[in-house]
Amino acid sequence: MKKKKRFKQKLLIASLVIGLVAVLSGCGYSTDPITKDSTGFWSHYIVFPLSWVITWFSDLFGGNYAVGIIVVTILIRLLIMPLMIKQLKSQKAMTSLQPKIKELQEKYSSKDNETKQKLQQETMRLYQENSVNPMMGCLPLLIQMPILLGFYQAISRTAEIKTDTFLWMQLGNPDPYYILPIVAALTTFLSSKISMMGQTQQNKSMAMIVYIMPVMILFMGITLPSALALYWIIGNIFTVFQTLLINNPFKNKREQEALAAAQLEEERLKKKAANMKASKKGGKKRK
């Protein structure tokens, strides 16, 4: 059962990696300038609206396209916030259910197929009763993939954005000093680490994502426009504050430690009571 779960988790991680690679592959799909007359569903309904919104906010801030990208990034994060809140609540519920799941695993510890199937059914029933979706954690990431590709094309196909400068770099080119990619990787790690804090050991089997994602972001940031690295940095900072406000992992960790201590104390008292009972029985027999 554990091996099967590990395989599924590795498969999920591989799928996410392949998905990001697919995003990279798609980045060069079209280089035609984007306008309101651009044809095709992707260009007309995804890339052009992103380009238009970035340009509109940039004009609002005196033609500063970096500020436009920052504002649009925050707006996108606000739009997907309901999903992120649901994800955080699902993570918290999953963590609180771990003792019950452990009990089920001990109850159905046999290796035969019938028992394994029963364990799966009981686990799914437990999830349904508590409105928990184990796959919910992947949904926000999957939604952000097309947004990332749309952002890339909006930048590379809009001359005003592509040629605008921010600090020491041109938004359409990679950061020549690798500062933004490094900051993007560090904030990705911080965001992922904070999200994973307070989770149980079983959930931590997915913790390799915490280390894989920053490395991927670093390499992507080195080769892709600096505007994308800026998008990642702002998005990661937003996620950190969002997690701390909605589902504070430090508070959750303290609660879990207190619960674990209470459970240990309860077990200690039960053992003490059982030992005292056994001692009394032994004393009566000797009499």
Curated annotation (Swiss-Prot):
Write out the GO MF terms.
membrane insertase activity
Q: Where is the lipid attached (N-palmitoyl cysteine)?
A: 27
Keyword hit for Lipid metabolism: no
Transmembrane intervals: 65-85, 135-155, 178-198, 207-224, 228-250
Question: From which residue to which does the signal peptide run?
Answer: 1-26
Q: Which Pfam families match?
A: 60KD_IMP
Q: How does this chain sit within the bilayer? A: Multi-pass membrane protein
Name the principal localization, coarsely classed. membrane
Keywords assigned by UniProt, alphabetized: Cell membrane, Chaperone, Lipoprotein, Membrane, Palmitate, Protein transport, Signal, Transmembrane, Transmembrane helix, Transport
Which locations, inside or outside the cell, does it occupy?
A: Cell membrane
Q: Which domain of life is it from?
A: Bacteria
Which processes are annotated in GO (biological process)?
protein insertion into membrane; protein transport
Q: Which InterPro entries match?
A: YidC/ALB3/OXA1/COX18, YidC/Oxa/ALB_C, YidC/YidC1/YidC2_Firmicutes, YidC_ALB_C
Which residues are covalently lipidated (S-diacylglycerol cysteine)? 27
Q: Which GO terms describe its cellular component?
A: plasma membrane
State the HAMAP family in the record. YidC_type2
Q: Which PANTHER family match?
A: CYTOCHROME C OXIDASE ASSEMBLY PROTEIN COX18, MITOCHONDRIAL, OXA1
- Of which family is this protein a member? Belongs to the OXA1/ALB3/YidC family. Type 2 subfamily.
> Main role?
Required for the insertion and/or proper folding and/or complex formation of integral membrane proteins into the membrane. Involved in integration of membrane proteins that insert both dependently and independently of the Sec translocase complex, as well as at least some lipoproteins.
Q: Output this protein's name.
A: Membrane protein insertase YidC 2
Question: Which organism does this record belong to?
Answer: Listeria innocua serovar 6a (strain ATCC BAA-680 / CLIP 11262)
Kindly list the organism's lineage: Bacteria, Bacillati, Bacillota, Bacilli, Bacillales
